[in-house]
Amino acid sequence: MDILSLTAVELAKAIREGKTTAVEATQAVLDRIAAGEDTYHCYVTVEREKALKQAEEVQKKIEAGELTGPLAGVPFAIKDNMCTEGTLTTCSSKILENFIPTFSAEAVLNLEKAGAVILGKTNMDEFAMGSTTETSYYGVTRNPRNPEHVPGGSSGGSAAAVAAEECFAALGSDTGGSIRQPASYCGVVGMKPTYGTVSRYGLIAYGSSLDQIGPLTKDVTDCATVLETITSHDPKDSTSMKREDTDFTSALVADVKGMKIGIPRDYFGEGLDPEVRDAVLAAAEVLKAQGAEVEEFDLSLVDYAIPTYYTIAAAEASSNLERFDGVKYGYRAQDAEDLHTMYKRSRSQGFGPEVKRRIMLGSFVLSSGYYDAYYLKALRVKALIKKAFDEAFAKYDVILGPVAPTTAPKLGSSLADPIKMYLGDIYTISINLAGLPGISVPCGTDSQGLPIGMQLIGDCFKEKTLIRAAYTYEQSVK
């Protein structure tokens, strides 16, 4: 049996049936990591001994009948901005190079309760600020589909680890597309749930009103299964929702008859690579052939999404990142003659250029004299974007479009031009601003063999509709 080719759900079934064990699966994936990390660099930290010990404990519980769930024994990777008790959590930043949390994020605990084995922490853009996983203090991650290209970001390490078979599934976080865009670039499935569905407790904050944890997986079945596992109401997160409809795997039905799918004309204009456009529209035709009603419509305000997002996200980041000052934990500059100099040097030396850029922008838009002109205006536009989506979902069940305007860029091409990097999020950020769920599903490759993702967007709390549409497409093209 080729263990590594199995999906997470298939692996758990094989373990339950005694065809393999959690220890064998963990050892196989650790061997793959050892062989591939020099090329791909998906991980910041690999907890080899800890993972094998955890796998042994899980295997005993499976054999005793104490763990029977659909993810028991499955090795997972965790993005390095989620706290993991006793394991280095760096946010891919120098400022947290020595930070070992004393608790785990709620989403990670939910996985562990289900019997998942935690392999380690994946590389990311520093503090999740970036779209290429090139702003990491610990080096760039490469795209397993073509190592000369980026894996996307900021959850690039998680997406690349799934694509390279260096884990069976992974957790990422999505503030403006950070799960969906790398999923598209690496040819895996990635989902951002409705805001408040998965607890943010233990997620190191970037933009608190936008951040959401979600799965990166090999297929839609795994995606629904992981989402069902990590979803829970958590009183430790004030934005956590109490949801009744969290049996997401019940939506794994290949049936879109009568489903109304809207295609925004605004998403298919100038700047979209023709190969991406053709692949996404071909995917829409597949759903149409399965009985969905597909039509074009106008979704205005997309042009305002980028300035609105970068105003709000930078403002929240400048506030959230104030806590990293060299006093209680993290990097501390040496030889400072007074407290103020120590703060200044710790932050100057600890943060990378992209993080500094966003802290400066955020501080500017929140400063007196500019607060109304920029920040409050951005909040008003955010409300208008939500209203535009509400109007669209009064008519359509699902909105279908591209995830990114191009396939994965070459390494180094985006860092030279930050604006180009920001524009790469044009199709994903409005979903975060509106708090909606979105999923990226592989829908082909370009002429270079680089993956293309189709994005399906749903109304708040309509993950099941998205899963049904994504599953139908996936089964239709198998």
PLM regions and their residue ranges:
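An N-terminal boundary/leader segment
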Residues: M1-K53, A289-G291, F364
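Short, conserved phosphate/pyrophosphate- and ester-handling motifs at nucleotide-, phospho-/glycolipid
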Residues: G18, K79, D219
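Short alpha-helical scaffolding segments that buttress acidic/His motifs in well-ordered protein cores
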Residues: A25-V29, T308-Y309, V355-S363
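Conserved hydrophobic/aromatic pocket- or pore-lining residues that grip, position, or stack substrates
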Residues: V29, A51, K79, L111, ...
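Structural helix-boundary/capping segments
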Residues: D31, A35, T39, A164-G271, ...
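Short helix-loop capping/hinge segments that flank enzyme active sites or metal/cofactor-binding pockets
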Residues: L71-C91, S250, D255-G262, A315-K386, ...
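Short glycine/serine-rich loop/turn segments
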Residues: L71-I213, P264-D266, A315, G401-I419
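Short, surface-exposed loop/helix-turn segments at secondary-structure junctions
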Residues: K94, N98, T141, T239-E244, ...
